[in-house]
């Protein structure tokens, strides 16, 4: 949406001077920013190593000298080892969860946040100036402030603050990208602006001249920022846990929108498969926070309450095990951080142990009293298992104290085994071994179960062969995604001085402004105005002075007496014409020209392959000989790019494209301005 402005209000001042956007924090201010700085440095090292590997592989294919081949193979082994080391360093940053947690949080298992995607600086100045001069026929030097604001806004988005202000900053830039696409990025022309983003998990760069890569990456970073906000919440309070659940649900909403909108992606961290796993993981963490809120004030020693907590814990463990299963499927396993999959596996075993511990407390400590609803408790016990233990019924378990104790000890034994598995998994991963709060919590819960078991242990326990059945999971939590409303805050188009976006866009090319002196005859200028922002000349009298001066029917008036009127309505322009009180007045008009954009012969994207990750996407076009009868090869659009040339580049992935016929998501990222809701804008 664009503000309606009166003439003279567009003074060309920098938006940063008007406090239009709040910049992100300095890259050296916070521990999280320091991690992001390290990530940027690692990305550069990975890029350098991949270039060396590509060069070595090319030399290996080109030479037949055995001595040179041996030297190249040796160098290639060093490069691959260095790449593996850098990948492990990047994985260590991805699992640096302690930096993102609340400062007073030492009794909760850390949550996993997503790291922000890193990018390289982009210089819009030259390309946009050329386009403004050529397409809009305006003096590009007058838009220095707007260009500086745009580059400042993009730079600020690299280090957003970890709060709602940071989200608003990213959202404002995302909306600006919609304006920029309509103003400066014609579908049939390459401006020469290259957007480079690094994969969040592997650090592999993806470079493309299409603004849709920028849009998708900003959406990913909005989701990542929500996860960092969620992990920062104070999980020792009910409000903090509710905020954490909401933050993770908002993150899944953004990722789900990204997944449904893009069928193919240039980097694997934004592929549908990876996004599906990330959504499952974040919903599991939201469920984890819901369970923590349920037991925050303690669990009453009441039969149904303990049973509810046990089944809820079993459900949390179950969803984490589902995430672990997804993470271990190819090719997700090769790209997701190993420490993440281990952490998810640890949580699955931990909550499985908690479920068995709660059931053991019910069976061992709880005594049936006369005031209890026996039928209700019997029904609850029967729903706890898929099948009752051999030789036992729900009524027997309730009334036979000895059988209840034996079954409770079996559950305690099962809980201890799950605790031991969780500890074993965490110690097998060197990264998780260094997370002190995780090791402390796992050890404390393990000792609690052991203590409870020792209190009821007898010398002949080895004769008790009763095995505890699996607990049926049950939850009242509804896993859902929250769709953030990106249009809730009014955003000013940085390049609004170019004129209303519905008219002054890449779809229409304009002539240079023509100065025309119009004169009244019998109180009439000899033409009629219509339209709104800007006004158009119609019903022009061919014999009037304005027509003699060169005014044409269909011209748009952009200036009256030196005052810009692109944003003025018909009545406002008429008032400006009448306000001078003179018989003659100078106006500036423009006319629509035919589009004559030429198709570039080739649009190249930097490619740097990385073993067992993915390759970058190249916008390749068939190289044909230039002949007099040659027709310009039509470049496939960013939205419809698919797999091509499989024999030549079997590992090349497809570009992001919009799903045709997908369900409507108008309430997800709605824009009041029709121009931003158009299909051409939304990827």
From Swiss-Prot:
<dbReference type="GO" id="GO:0051497">
    <property type="term" value="P:negative regulation of stress fiber assembly"/>
</dbReference>
<dbReference type="Pfam" id="PF03097">
    <property type="entry name" value="BRO1"/>
</dbReference>
<dbReference type="InterPro" id="IPR036274">
    <property type="entry name" value="HR1_rpt_sf"/>
</dbReference>
<dbReference type="InterPro" id="IPR011072">
    <property type="entry name" value="HR1_rho-bd"/>
</dbReference>
<protein>
    <recommendedName>
        <fullName>Rhophilin-2-A</fullName>
    </recommendedName>
</protein>
<dbReference type="InterPro" id="IPR036034">
    <property type="entry name" value="PDZ_sf"/>
</dbReference>
<feature type="domain" description="PDZ">
    <location>
        <begin position="515"/>
        <end position="592"/>
    </location>
</feature>
<feature type="domain" description="BRO1">
    <location>
        <begin position="110"/>
        <end position="501"/>
    </location>
</feature>
<dbReference type="GO" id="GO:0048471">
    <property type="term" value="C:perinuclear region of cytoplasm"/>
</dbReference>
<dbReference type="InterPro" id="IPR004328">
    <property type="entry name" value="BRO1_dom"/>
</dbReference>
<dbReference type="InterPro" id="IPR047138">
    <property type="entry name" value="RHPN1_2"/>
</dbReference>
<dbReference type="InterPro" id="IPR047902">
    <property type="entry name" value="RHPN2_BRO1"/>
</dbReference>
<comment type="similarity">
    <text>Belongs to the RHPN family.</text>
</comment>
<dbReference type="Pfam" id="PF02185">
    <property type="entry name" value="HR1"/>
</dbReference>
<comment type="subunit">
    <text>Interacts with RhoA.</text>
</comment>
<dbReference type="GO" id="GO:0007165">
    <property type="term" value="P:signal transduction"/>
</dbReference>
<keyword id="KW-0963">Cytoplasm</keyword>
<dbReference type="Pfam" id="PF00595">
    <property type="entry name" value="PDZ"/>
</dbReference>
<dbReference type="InterPro" id="IPR001478">
    <property type="entry name" value="PDZ"/>
</dbReference>
<feature type="domain" description="REM-1">
    <location>
        <begin position="25"/>
        <end position="99"/>
    </location>
</feature>
<dbReference type="InterPro" id="IPR038499">
    <property type="entry name" value="BRO1_sf"/>
</dbReference>
<keyword id="KW-0175">Coiled coil</keyword>
<comment type="function">
    <text>Binds specifically to GTP-Rho.</text>
</comment>
């Amino acid at each position: 949406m664009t503000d309606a402005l009166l003439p003279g209000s567009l003074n060309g001042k920098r938006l940063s001077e008007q406090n239009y956007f709040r910049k992100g924090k300095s890259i050296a201010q916070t521990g999280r920013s320091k991690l992001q700085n390290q990530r940027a440095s690692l990305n550069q090292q990975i890029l350098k190593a991949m270039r060396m590997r590509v060069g070595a592989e090319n030399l290996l294919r080109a030479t037949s000298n055995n001595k040179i081949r041996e030297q190249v193979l040796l160098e290639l082994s060093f490069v691959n080892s260095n790449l593996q080391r850098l990948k492990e360093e990047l994985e260590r940053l991805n699992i640096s969860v302690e930096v993102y947690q609340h400062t007073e949080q030492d009794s909760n298992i850390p949550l996993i946040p997503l790291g922000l995607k890193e990018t390289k600086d982009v210089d819009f100045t030259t390309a946009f100036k050329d386009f403004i001069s050529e397409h809009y026929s305006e003096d590009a030097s007058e838009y220095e402030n707007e260009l500086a604001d745009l580059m400042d806004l993009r730079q600020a988005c690299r280090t957003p603050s970890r709060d709602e202000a940071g989200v608003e900053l990213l959202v404002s830039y995302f909306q600006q990208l919609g304006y920029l696409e309509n103003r400066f990025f014609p579908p049939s022309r390459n401006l020469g602006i290259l957007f480079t983003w690094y994969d969040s998990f592997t650090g592999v760069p993806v470079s493309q001249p299409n603004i849709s890569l920028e849009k998708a990456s900003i959406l990913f970073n909005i989701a990542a920022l929500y996860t960092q906000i969620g992990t920062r919440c104070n999980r020792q309070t009910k409000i903090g846990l509710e905020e954490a659940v909401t933050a993770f649900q908002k993150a899944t909403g953004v990722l789900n929108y990204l997944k449904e909108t893009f069928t193919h992606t240039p980097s694997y961290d934004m592929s549908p498969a990876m996004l599906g796993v990330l959504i499952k993981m974040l919903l599991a963490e939201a469920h984890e926070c819901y369970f923590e809120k349920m037991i925050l004030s303690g669990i009453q020693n009441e039969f149904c309450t303990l049973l509810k907590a046990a089944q809820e814990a079993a459900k949390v463990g179950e969803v984490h095990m589902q995430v672990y299963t997804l993470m271990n499927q190819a090719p997700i396993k090769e790209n997701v951080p190993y420490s993440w999959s281990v952490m998810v596996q640890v949580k699955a075993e931990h909550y499985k142990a908690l479920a068995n511990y709660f059931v053991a407390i019910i069976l061992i400590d709880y005594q049936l009293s006369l005031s209890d609803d026996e039928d209700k408790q019997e029904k609850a016990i029967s729903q706890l298992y898929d099948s009752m233990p051999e030789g036992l019924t729900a009524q027997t378990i309730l009334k036979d104290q000895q059988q209840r104790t034996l079954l409770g000890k079996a559950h305690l034994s099962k809980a201890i085994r799950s605790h031991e598995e969780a500890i074993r998994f965490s110690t097998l991963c060197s990264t998780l071994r260094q997370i002190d709060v995780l090791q402390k919590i796992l050890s404390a819960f393990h000792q609690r179960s052991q203590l409870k078991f020792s209190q009821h242990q007898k010398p002949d326990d080895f004769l008790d062969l009763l095995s505890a059945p699996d607990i049926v999971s049950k939850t009242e939590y509804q896993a859902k995604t929250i769709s953030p409303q990106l249009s809730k805050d009014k955003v000013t188009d940085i390049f609004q001085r170019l004129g209303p976006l519905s008219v002054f866009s890449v779809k229409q090319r304009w002539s240079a402004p023509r100065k025309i002196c119009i004169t009244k005859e019998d109180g009439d200028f000899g033409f009629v105005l219509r339209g709104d922002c800007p006004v158009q000349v119609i019903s022009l009298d061919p014999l009037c002075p304005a027509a003699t001066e060169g005014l044409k029917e269909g011209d748009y008036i952009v200036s009256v007496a030196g005052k810009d009127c692109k944003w003025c309505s018909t009545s406002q322009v008429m008032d400006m014409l009448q306000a001078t009180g003179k018989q003659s007045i100078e106006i500036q008009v423009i006319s629509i020209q035919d589009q004559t954009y030429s198709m570039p012969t080739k649009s190249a994207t930097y490619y740097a392959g990385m073993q067992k990750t993915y390759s970058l996407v190249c916008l390749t076009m068939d190289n044909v000989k230039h002949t007099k009868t040659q027709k310009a090869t039509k470049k496939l659009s960013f939205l419809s790019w698919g797999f091509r040339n499989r024999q030549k580049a079997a590992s090349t992935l497809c570009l992001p494209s919009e799903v045709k016929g997908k369900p409507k998501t108008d309430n997800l990222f709605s824009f009041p301005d029709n121009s931003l809701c158009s299909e051409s804008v939304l990827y």
